Amino acid sequence: LRRLAGLRRALPPLIAAACPLLGDDSAQLVHYAVLAEATGARLLATNNIRYHVPSRRRLADVLSAIRLRCSVDALGQAAEPNAERHLKSPAEMARLFARYPDALQASLDVLATTRGFSLDHLRYEYPDEVLDPGLTAQQSLEARVAEAVAARWPVQVPDAITARIAHEMRLINDLGYAPYFLTVHEIIRFARARGILCQGRGSAANSTVCYVLGITAVDPEKHDLLFERFVSASRGEPPDIDIDFEHDRREEVIQHLYERYGRDRAAICATLIRYRPRSAIREVGKAMGLSEDITARLAKAGWGPGREMSLAELAQDEGFDINDPRLAMTLELAEELQDFPRHTATHVGGFVITRGKLTELAVVTQAAMEDRTVLEWDKDDIDALGIMKVDVLGLGMLSCLRRGFDLLARHRRLALNLANLPRDCAETYAMLRRADSVGVFQVESRAQMNMLPRLKPRAFYDLVVQVAIVRPGPIQGDMVHPYLRRRQGLEAVEYPAPDPAFGPPDELRQVLGRTLGVPLFQEQAMRLAIVAAGFTPEEADQLRRAMATFRQQGLVTRHKEKLVAGMTRRGYAQDLAERVFAQIEGFGSYGFPESHAASFAHLVYASAWLKRHHPAAFACALLNSQPMGFYAPAQIMRDAREHGVVVRAVDVNASDWDSSLEEAPESTGGLALRLGLRLVAGLAQRDAEALLAAPQRESHSATEEELAILSAFGGIVAFN
């Protein structure tokens, strides 16, 4: 303390003192006052606060019991002796420290030094490594966009594209987001230089700048996507780009980010796990000393979304005596504990990168996984502070497609990638209409297979709808059957018109024409609000957010009143306005953005095309990319056989670790599928590699002992 007192500081060292009313407060305060005088420190009046109101003392004891893994009755000295550790009023603090006015003044002085502080003062700066020499971030981005536009449209750039890029670049410049786009572009360039398949998705697909830079594969102009769904001046938060990489090569990208920016400047953000009804009941029940069978029954009753009854009502329905004091207190405290933070975990892929040291901004810890560091803030904290986040995600289908392309390059000398696949292949769409989609991305589930023959996709946009329509949102909003009836010509497509004084009669057709008058996407919900109810783009985005945050019922109600009033004012019928809102509300939390569905539709088409034209390569790539998808290896093999592919058994003389292709005129496409040793149940890769490295493997003859050992793995093994 004396050494600290000798340093030049805005405030001298402080000794925090509290009056918890434990009987020895006076002696403790005298001791601290003497210590402060002897060291040149100041006494600081505090209250060692743990909860905001006295009634939270019981919950504080329960949390202590949960942390210490004991019951409340066994807490001993770890229990709160009284309820004094709460936020007290200035009058209460003045009474407690009446003999130490300097301690009260010290608290006021500390408050004065922090009075002007705001979280807005935590300034975030984008990385500057991505800038081109001699150029600002905006100039660097403009140069890269111009180069990419010239490469994509070498003859003439469409006017609509030019206008969209100008609009986006203006907004990017105003908001200072150019370094963000440059950083993401650098990540994409690194991955492609390494031959790693990648594709941006989510709201980033609403951006033409992202499209021309190759970050996303969706043309927003073609799909009439709103840029404000991605970047909005009113939101005051940075853009958020999700990028899918091959799931078994994502680690290369993650380690590249660490190497390029340093572990003191790059980390994966945390995700906050909160108490839900079941976990709250279990933890509080244990702390309160309830038996395991009682807590299990209560937890089961409280399980599931959309619970409307209180825990006490649920317990009563289960036959419990809710007048029992211990049970009643348990249920009350479990209600209080819900939505409390329980623990942090590592986000699936949200990477934070800064110009300065991230460790000076927040706590960065070592993750459980090797070579990973975690920022102890979640995505909501990061959004609130305007910090750049890039989601580096893994997608199994990208690994599968890359393996398929590599196999075709090796065996058929075809140089295929996601950009040069033949488009609008009638045979591919015909295969999908038959629901022949085992292994095909996003449309291989039973629900999707049932929908394919009903929707009958014939063009790319049909795949966009296919991806989006089999979701809880469209189903809850009663949009699926009207869309299918209209698509099949069983129901007339109608577009109600506003009062002629307020707009053209076809304004709803412009929004819903491609989906036959039925809103299927979040972007359509936003456009409906703008066109039919007079919302601004920023208000429409707030509506989308209110829908997504379904717990904030007050916000939803206000938006409903505004939307219904806006539509009726412009001449639409009241029942239509309420029906439109009900549809928007139905898929607000579970519906797909059109940009996201379009990004996934590209992979649907690519995987379907590969399956239709090169079934052996597709099946081989699927097997080598496991685990992924819905189907086990045996089902993938059976499907390959049904498509005329010859499937050859595992053979120690012919098989590698991965499955492979062999020339076979009798097989579809002239290629047979040779199963790999990885499919032998229980066979470790290191053991298989030792077998493969054995000399003269081609002339290997298995002994009875070897047969017994290998047969124990449960696989199909053939020997010469």
Labelled PLM ranges:
Residues 49-71, 237, 241-243, 622:
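Short alpha-helix plus adjacent loop in nuclease-associated cores
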